[in-house]
Amino acid sequence: LKCKNKVVPFLKCKNKVVPFLCYKMTLKKVTPKIKRG
């Protein structure tokens, strides 16, 4: 996921299927890999 980018995670994830999820994970500073697994 593009969420890995800490610059503008919300904006990048905005075009994805799980924008809110990516946003929350970024706030928690948790890599998407953990949740995806």
Curated annotation (Swiss-Prot):
Tissue expr: Expressed by the venom gland.
GO molecular function: toxin activity
Keyword Ribonucleoprotein: no
PTM description: May contain several disulfide bonds.
Keywords: Blood coagulation cascade inhibiting toxin, Disulfide bond, Hemostasis impairing toxin, Secreted, Toxin
GO CC, one annotated term: extracellular region
Keyword Iron tagged: no
Family membership: Belongs to the three-finger toxin family. Short-chain subfamily. Type IB cytotoxin sub-subfamily.
Record function comment: Hemextin B (monomer): does not show anticoagulant activity. Seems only to synergitically enhance hemextin A activity.
Protein name per the record: Hemextin B
Native species: Hemachatus haemachatus
